[in-house]
C-alpha cells in the first residue's frame, strides 16, 4: 500500500581550541577559580595540561593555525604566544599568566595595557590583528559560505506555486500589512486567489493573530519589493534571512574559535542542512527568529572583547598613575567601563526576536546571564579582589539597564502599525471596557495589554491534536519532521515519467549535522564541566535557551521546526567537536593529517546527505519509490 504524508497547517585569525580556555580563562566564566601561579612563571594548571599532551585544535594559548591545517603560513606566528605543550619551553609575555595582584612579582609589567589585553583577550583581538595574508579570509570565508547558502535557498524559490503549510497564515497576514498595516480577515477561497496571482480579496474586518509583527513585516518587505502575487515575492525575505544566518554563523565561528578552517566548516554545515534550508525557503516565522537570536549572540560576543579591552585600558591607566603598579585600593572593585554599545545592539536584536516570537524571551534570560558571567570572570582574571560584587554592580546592573529597556522599547515599536490603526483587532478594546483606577493609562496601552493577555491564554491552551505534532524529546534525532507539502503527480505531468510520482517538502535535517550535533552536545557538556571552556558553555546556553523550555509544556501542541531557533548553536557545537578531531597546528603531522581526513570525511558525508535528500526538501518531482527510499523512518511519513 502506498503511504503518503498528509500535508496540513499548524493550528495556531589564529585558531583557538575548544579544548583549552582563552587567555586567562582557566575556568568557566564566573567560576571564581584561578590558576595558582609562580611569580613570573607559568601556571600550574597550564603545566598540568602540558604534561597530558597538547589540547586539540589551535589553542587560544597557542595562537598559530595553518590553512590548510598542518601548514604554517610565513610570518604567521605572533610573538609571545607559545605556552608549554608536552613539556616544551614557553615564551610568556609579561603578565601573561599573572592573574591577580597578590600573586604577582612584577606588577608594573603585569598591569600594562598590553599585558592586560593579552591576558584577557589574546594578541589577536580583532580581524585587524590577523597577519595581512589572512585578513581577507576573515570576511571571504563567511561570504563564500553565504553565497553557497544563498544559491541553495534562492534556486527555484517560487516552487511550489502554492501556499505551503503555515504560509496560509503568515503570507496573508504580511500582505495585510502591506495594504493596511495590520492583519485583516480573508474569505474562504483566499488561497486560490493568492495562487492565481490575485491577492486583493481582503475583507474589512480585523483578524485575530497570536504572534507579534516582526516576522510578518519582514515577509511583507519581500512582497513590497517583488509583489504579493508570486511565491518568490512572499518567500524572498525568508531566503534572505536564512542566507544572512549562514554568513553570521560562519563569522561567529571565526570569532569564537579564531580559526578560518572552523569558520568555513560551520558556515558549510548550516548552508547545506535540510531543516534550515526548508525553513529558509518557506515564509514561516522561525527562520527570522533564528536570525535575530544569532545576531544578538554575535553582538554579545563582540561586547565580550570590547568590555575586556575597556577593562584593560582603564585598569592600566590607573596602574600607570601609581609607582610600582596599581594600589590595593584600585584592585578592590576595578573601574567602571562606560557605555557598552554592542550591548545596545544585542538589546535591539533581542527585541526584534521577541517581536517575532515570544519564545525568544528565554534567550533574553540566558544571554543576559551569560554576558554578566563573562564580565565577572574578566574582573577575576584582571586581578580585581572583589570581582563578584564589583562585577554585579559595575557590569551586571548596567547590562540589565542597557539590554532590557532597549529590547522592551524595540518590541513595543514593532507594534507601530497596530498603534497607528483604528480598526486592528482589540485596538478599541479599552474604549468599550473602562477600568476605574487604570484610566491614567492611554487606551492604546490598555488595549495592547489586553491583546497580550488573550494571546498568552491562547498559547497556554494550545493542545489540539495534529498529525505532525512532535515531542521535544524527538527533535534532535529528527523523530517526526513536519510535512509542509505533498502531492502525487501522475504520469505525463512535467517531471513525472512513471505511473505515480511524489512532490514533497519535508524539513528533515541533515543526519550528519543533527545526529552528529546531538553527540557533540554531550561532548561539549563534559568539556564545559571538565575543562571549563567558556566557548562550550556559550554554545550550550544557546541550545538550552531554545530547547529546554519546551519541556515545561508537555500538553502543548509543538512542532519540530521550532528547533531552527537553536540550530545555529547545534552547528557551532558540532564544529567545536570537529575542531577537537582536527587537532592543533603544534600536533605531530600524522595527528593533524588523520584529523583532517576524519573532518573531511564528515563534511563529504554531510554534502552527500544533502544531495540525497534535496528532492524532498524542495518539492522536486520524483518517482514514488524514490520518495519512499528517502523516508528512513516510518515517523517521517
List each model region and its residues.
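Short acidic/glycine- and proline-prone juxtamembrane loop motifs at membrane-interface regions
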Residues: 163-164, 234, 238, 278-288, ...
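Start-transfer (signal-anchor) and selected internal transmembrane alpha helices
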Residues: 1-152, 394-407, 595-599, 603
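Aromatic-rich transmembrane-lumenal/periplasmic boundary elements in polytopic membrane proteins
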Residues: 154-195, 398-399, 407-480, 622-631
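Transmembrane-helix motifs of polytopic, lipid-linked glycan transferases
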Residues: 236-257, 295
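Transmembrane-helix signature of polytopic, membrane-embedded enzymes
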Residues: 144-145, 232, 249-272, 291, ...
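Membrane-interface transmembrane helices that cradle and orient dolichyl/undecaprenyl
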Residues: 102, 257, 296-342, 372-382
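Transmembrane helical bundles and short interhelical boundary loops of multi-pass, membrane-embedded
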Residues: 2-24, 32, 38-51, 55, ...
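Short helix- or helix-capping micro-motifs
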Residues: 149, 266-271, 278, 350, ...
